[in-house]
Amino acid sequence: MAIAAMEFTTRSNNNALRGVYPIMTSAERHEARYQRRKAKRDAHRAARIGKYDNYDRCTSVSAIMEANWAARKGVMWKGSVARYNMRSFRNARQSHRLLAEGKDTRQGYYNFKIVERGKLRDVHSLHYAERVIRRSVCTNAMVPILSNGLIYDNGASLDGKGISFAIDRCATMLHRYWRKYRDNEGYVLVIDFRKYFDNIQHEPMFEVYDRHFHDQRLNRLCRAFVTGTGAQGLYIGPEDSQISAIAYPSKIDHLIKDVWRIKEFERYMDDSVLIMRSKEDLIKVRDALFAEYAKQGIILNPKKTQIVKLSRGFTFLKTQFFLMEGGRVLQKPCREATIRQRQKLKSFRRFVAEGKMIIKEAGCSYMSWRGYMEHKDAHRTVRNMDNLFFNLFHTKPWIKMKTTKTKGVNKRWQIILT
């Protein structure tokens, strides 16, 4: 009996050394597991992007100089850029001193309007000195931190992604849907935000900053960029507005992907698509999704937000997607884009006749459009547009020059298509 008691006492002491926790309820154990997972995620996040959450990193003289070198590319012909670069090091030191002292570096905006695809857009451009500061903050803090929390199928204005990436992901999503169901029966919810930048609320935007920026000085600087626009909304033009607008509804994106477990979802800035098998389920998801958007102050465009049958095709990023019965995905340009290009070529012909443009410039613009169209199922559209360009300008810039060597002498000739 003494031996048994001694063994029991030893085990009890060992348990005490290891730490014996009191009896926990199911909810308490669930909370403890959640806290452990959260601490593990925070540690991984700190290892990945902890170095970017640093105010001094993006306000140093070297960071501002590098931001200036990146910001001046392609715009050195502007007077403001040239004047800044005449004394770039002195200007960088002055910006660093103001930021180190916590002073306001905002200088206001240049406001102008442009017409893009028939839409009148109000653009606000920054003074170049402030543009350099914001470029440094975006490169060294905002973009690496905010992009880390985005879903993979959100590729607007990010390095390595873009429109081509989004279109490829949409095609991949359709291929995955066909492999799962082996048909093209289903429904697509096409979503478009109305005046997205103008309707972004500041308080929800500040909540996004509070979740990601733990350095209080960096947090206050990013908030200052937003409050300079007025009571609500973000201005189109500053680089920080782009990454902020991308991350603004990211919480809803994760709700769709992680909580509702809907894989067939993609967002590109203010355009989104969501595919489901049942129309009734899609309507329920739509109503719940619209309620979440309303909490963020996001207003939907009633004309462009609609549910369509997958077999009829849908339009996303100016591209018409069709999932065929055999699993093939067709990508065709939308009709409006083709009409706009024909009108543009006719305008170029008028500019050439008036001496405002040379044929080479018109050819470069057309070849850019043509190269983009060659990635789509638009052979007939490209052929008809080639005929229109030849009839207007009497040249074929898409015909490449071939080079061969004969007895050490290069001979060039042009392929003549009949």
Predicted ranges, named:
Residues 1-93, 411-418:
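Non-catalytic, polymerase-adjacent accessory regions of viral genome-replication enzymes
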Residues 2-32, 126, 135, 225-229, ...:
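Right-hand nucleic-acid polymerase module
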Residues 51-54, 140-198:
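Active-site-proximal segment of RNA-dependent polymerases
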Residues 97-119, 132, 217-228:
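Reverse-transcriptase-like RNA-dependent polymerase core
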Residues 109, 266-270, 302-303:
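Short Gly/Ser/Thr- and Asp/Glu-enriched loop/turn motifs at secondary-structure junctions
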Residues 119-151, 230-257:
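Conserved pre-motif C helix in the palm subdomain of viral-like polymerases
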Residues 168, 173-269, 273-292, 308, ...:
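Conserved polymerase palm-domain catalytic core
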